[in-house]
Amino acid sequence: PYPMSWEEQSILFAELPDHLRRMALYKVNSGSREQEVVKLRWDWEIPIPELNTSVFLIPADFGGRHESSGVKNGDERLVVLNNVAKSVIEGQRGLDPVWVFPYGQPDQNGKATPVHRMNDSAWKKARVRAAKKFQERFMRPAPAGFASIRVHDLKHTFGRRLRAAGVTEEDRKALLGHKNGSITSHYSAAELGKLIDEANRISATDS
Protein backbone atom coordinates (compact mmCIF):
# COMPACT_ATOMS: atom_id res chain seq x y z
CA PRO A 1 0.00 0.00 0.00
CA TYR A 2 1.21 3.51 -0.76
CA PRO A 3 -0.63 6.40 0.94
CA MET A 4 -0.01 9.60 -1.01
CA SER A 5 1.02 12.93 0.39
CA TRP A 6 -1.07 15.98 -0.51
CA GLU A 7 1.69 17.18 -2.85
CA GLU A 8 1.77 13.83 -4.64
CA GLN A 9 -2.01 13.89 -4.92
CA SER A 10 -2.00 17.32 -6.55
CA ILE A 11 0.69 16.23 -9.04
CA LEU A 12 -1.10 12.99 -9.96
CA PHE A 13 -4.61 14.44 -10.15
CA ALA A 14 -3.41 17.25 -12.43
CA GLU A 15 -2.35 14.56 -14.93
CA LEU A 16 -5.62 12.60 -14.88
CA PRO A 17 -8.28 13.12 -17.55
CA ASP A 18 -11.29 14.97 -16.14
CA HIS A 19 -13.58 11.95 -15.68
CA LEU A 20 -10.85 9.98 -13.86
CA ARG A 21 -9.94 12.98 -11.72
CA ARG A 22 -13.55 13.30 -10.55
CA MET A 23 -13.70 9.62 -9.61
CA ALA A 24 -10.28 9.72 -7.93
CA LEU A 25 -11.16 12.82 -5.92
CA TYR A 26 -14.36 11.12 -4.76
CA LYS A 27 -12.50 7.89 -3.95
CA VAL A 28 -9.71 9.49 -1.91
CA ASN A 29 -12.32 11.39 0.12
CA SER A 30 -14.80 8.56 0.65
CA GLY A 31 -12.60 5.47 1.05
CA SER A 32 -14.73 3.61 -1.49
CA ARG A 33 -13.51 0.58 -3.40
CA GLU A 34 -12.94 0.92 -7.14
CA GLN A 35 -16.13 -0.87 -8.21
CA GLU A 36 -18.17 1.09 -5.65
CA VAL A 37 -17.05 4.23 -7.49
CA VAL A 38 -17.33 3.26 -11.16
CA LYS A 39 -20.74 1.61 -10.67
CA LEU A 40 -22.15 4.09 -8.14
CA ARG A 41 -25.89 4.51 -8.74
CA TRP A 42 -28.21 7.38 -7.89
CA ASP A 43 -30.81 4.98 -6.50
CA TRP A 44 -28.33 4.11 -3.73
CA GLU A 45 -28.38 7.72 -2.50
CA ILE A 46 -30.31 8.35 0.73
CA PRO A 47 -31.11 11.97 1.67
CA ILE A 48 -30.44 12.98 5.28
CA PRO A 49 -32.56 16.16 5.47
CA GLU A 50 -31.64 16.89 9.10
CA LEU A 51 -28.02 17.30 8.00
CA ASN A 52 -28.76 18.87 4.63
CA THR A 53 -26.79 16.12 2.93
CA SER A 54 -27.05 12.56 1.71
CA VAL A 55 -25.21 9.25 2.07
CA PHE A 56 -24.87 6.29 -0.26
CA LEU A 57 -25.78 2.78 0.82
CA ILE A 58 -24.10 0.13 -1.35
CA PRO A 59 -26.33 -2.97 -1.28
CA ALA A 60 -24.96 -6.14 0.31
CA ASP A 61 -25.43 -8.08 -2.93
CA PHE A 62 -23.45 -5.64 -5.09
CA GLY A 63 -20.73 -7.67 -6.78
CA GLY A 64 -18.84 -5.20 -8.95
CA ARG A 65 -17.06 -6.68 -11.95
CA HIS A 66 -17.08 -10.16 -10.48
CA GLU A 67 -18.40 -11.59 -7.26
CA SER A 68 -15.28 -10.93 -5.21
CA SER A 69 -14.81 -7.29 -6.15
CA GLY A 70 -17.83 -5.59 -4.62
CA VAL A 71 -18.80 -5.11 -1.01
CA LYS A 72 -16.56 -7.05 1.36
CA ASN A 73 -18.04 -9.28 4.09
CA GLY A 74 -21.52 -9.39 2.56
CA ASP A 75 -22.91 -6.39 4.42
CA GLU A 76 -24.36 -3.14 3.18
CA ARG A 77 -21.69 -0.48 2.90
CA LEU A 78 -22.42 3.00 4.14
CA VAL A 79 -20.56 5.80 2.33
CA VAL A 80 -20.62 9.18 4.05
CA LEU A 81 -19.57 12.26 2.11
CA ASN A 82 -17.12 14.81 3.41
CA ASN A 83 -17.23 18.27 1.85
CA VAL A 84 -14.97 17.33 -1.05
CA ALA A 85 -16.77 14.07 -1.86
CA LYS A 86 -20.09 15.90 -1.62
CA SER A 87 -18.94 18.59 -4.06
CA VAL A 88 -17.90 15.88 -6.55
CA ILE A 89 -21.34 14.24 -6.26
CA GLU A 90 -23.14 17.57 -6.70
CA GLY A 91 -21.09 18.17 -9.85
CA GLN A 92 -22.33 14.85 -11.28
CA ARG A 93 -26.03 15.54 -10.76
CA GLY A 94 -28.05 15.65 -13.94
CA LEU A 95 -25.43 13.93 -16.12
CA ASP A 96 -27.31 10.62 -16.15
CA PRO A 97 -30.43 9.26 -14.40
CA VAL A 98 -28.80 5.95 -13.39
CA TRP A 99 -25.02 6.25 -13.04
CA VAL A 100 -23.23 8.85 -10.94
CA PHE A 101 -20.11 8.49 -13.13
CA PRO A 102 -21.49 7.68 -16.62
CA TYR A 103 -18.17 7.50 -18.43
CA GLY A 104 -18.25 4.17 -20.28
CA GLN A 105 -18.99 3.67 -23.97
CA PRO A 106 -22.72 4.12 -24.69
CA ASP A 107 -24.59 0.82 -25.14
CA GLN A 108 -26.34 -0.22 -28.37
CA ASN A 109 -29.35 1.93 -27.43
CA GLY A 110 -27.17 4.98 -26.88
CA LYS A 111 -27.58 4.84 -23.08
CA ALA A 112 -24.73 5.79 -20.79
CA THR A 113 -22.75 3.05 -19.07
CA PRO A 114 -20.10 3.05 -16.35
CA VAL A 115 -16.43 2.37 -17.10
CA HIS A 116 -15.24 -1.13 -16.14
CA ARG A 117 -12.37 0.12 -14.02
CA MET A 118 -10.41 3.23 -13.06
CA ASN A 119 -7.07 1.44 -13.40
CA ASP A 120 -6.92 1.77 -17.18
CA SER A 121 -4.31 2.93 -19.68
CA ALA A 122 -5.15 6.60 -18.98
CA TRP A 123 -4.41 6.04 -15.26
CA LYS A 124 -1.13 4.30 -16.06
CA LYS A 125 -0.02 7.04 -18.47
CA ALA A 126 -0.93 9.74 -15.94
CA ARG A 127 1.13 7.89 -13.32
CA VAL A 128 4.21 7.99 -15.58
CA ARG A 129 3.76 11.72 -16.26
CA ALA A 130 3.21 12.41 -12.56
CA ALA A 131 6.45 10.63 -11.59
CA LYS A 132 8.31 12.77 -14.14
CA LYS A 133 6.71 15.96 -12.77
CA PHE A 134 7.63 14.89 -9.24
CA GLN A 135 11.28 14.52 -10.26
CA GLU A 136 11.27 17.91 -12.00
CA ARG A 137 9.73 19.63 -8.98
CA PHE A 138 11.74 18.01 -6.20
CA MET A 139 14.99 17.24 -8.06
CA ARG A 140 14.91 13.63 -6.96
CA PRO A 141 13.25 10.50 -8.33
CA ALA A 142 9.64 9.90 -7.35
CA PRO A 143 9.21 7.26 -4.62
CA ALA A 144 8.67 3.82 -6.16
CA GLY A 145 5.22 3.59 -4.57
CA PHE A 146 4.15 6.86 -6.17
CA ALA A 147 5.62 5.97 -9.57
CA SER A 148 3.50 2.80 -9.56
CA ILE A 149 0.52 4.18 -7.58
CA ARG A 150 -2.56 1.97 -7.81
CA VAL A 151 -6.20 2.99 -7.71
CA HIS A 152 -6.56 1.02 -4.46
CA ASP A 153 -3.91 3.26 -2.88
CA LEU A 154 -6.50 6.07 -2.85
CA LYS A 155 -8.40 4.09 -0.21
CA HIS A 156 -5.19 3.57 1.80
CA THR A 157 -4.52 7.30 1.52
CA PHE A 158 -7.96 8.09 2.98
CA GLY A 159 -7.37 5.64 5.85
CA ARG A 160 -3.91 7.04 6.61
CA ARG A 161 -5.22 10.61 6.62
CA LEU A 162 -8.03 9.70 9.00
CA ARG A 163 -5.51 8.16 11.37
CA ALA A 164 -3.17 11.17 11.10
CA ALA A 165 -6.13 13.43 11.93
CA GLY A 166 -6.77 11.48 15.14
CA VAL A 167 -9.98 9.74 14.04
CA THR A 168 -10.68 6.74 16.30
CA GLU A 169 -10.23 3.21 15.01
CA GLU A 170 -13.95 2.52 15.36
CA ASP A 171 -14.88 5.54 13.25
CA ARG A 172 -12.12 4.76 10.73
CA LYS A 173 -13.55 1.27 10.30
CA ALA A 174 -17.03 2.67 9.74
CA LEU A 175 -15.74 5.22 7.21
CA LEU A 176 -13.68 2.61 5.34
CA GLY A 177 -16.51 0.08 5.25
CA HIS A 178 -14.67 -2.44 7.44
CA LYS A 179 -17.34 -2.61 10.10
CA ASN A 180 -18.88 -6.03 10.55
CA GLY A 181 -22.60 -6.57 11.01
CA SER A 182 -25.10 -4.75 8.86
CA ILE A 183 -25.76 -2.03 11.39
CA THR A 184 -24.50 0.68 9.08
CA SER A 185 -27.99 1.50 7.85
CA HIS A 186 -29.26 2.06 11.37
CA TYR A 187 -27.20 5.09 12.34
CA SER A 188 -29.10 8.03 13.74
CA ALA A 189 -28.71 11.42 12.07
CA ALA A 190 -26.54 12.51 15.02
CA GLU A 191 -24.21 9.53 14.57
CA LEU A 192 -24.02 10.15 10.82
CA GLY A 193 -23.25 13.80 11.52
CA LYS A 194 -20.34 12.75 13.75
CA LEU A 195 -18.97 10.45 11.02
CA ILE A 196 -19.22 13.24 8.45
CA ASP A 197 -17.39 15.59 10.84
CA GLU A 198 -14.65 12.97 11.26
CA ALA A 199 -14.34 12.51 7.47
CA ASN A 200 -13.97 16.29 7.12
CA ARG A 201 -10.99 16.35 9.49
CA ILE A 202 -8.70 15.02 6.77
CA SER A 203 -8.86 18.17 4.71
CA ALA A 204 -6.22 19.84 6.86
CA THR A 205 -3.78 17.01 7.55
CA ASP A 206 -0.77 15.59 5.80
CA SER A 207 1.41 12.66 6.71
Roles of regions detected by a PLM:
Residues 3-11, 30, 39-91:
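Conserved tyrosine-mediated DNA breakage-rejoining catalytic core shared by Y-recombinases
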Residues 22-25, 29-36, 153-179, 186:
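C-terminal catalytic core of tyrosine-transesterase DNA break-rejoin enzymes
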Residues 1, 5, 15-17, 26, ...:
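Residue-level marker of regulatory loop/turn positions in helix-turn-helix DNA-binding domains and
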Residues 62-65, 86, 107, 165, ...:
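Catalytic-site neighborhood detector that most strongly recognizes the C-terminal catalytic loop/helix
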Residues 19-20, 81, 115, 119, ...:
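Hydrophobic (often cysteine-bearing) scaffold residues that line and stabilize catalytic clefts
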Residues 7, 80-146:
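Active-site/catalytic core of tyrosine-dependent DNA strand-transfer enzymes
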Residues 1-40, 95, 155:
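Basic, Lys/Arg- and aromatic-enriched nucleic-acid-binding interface segment
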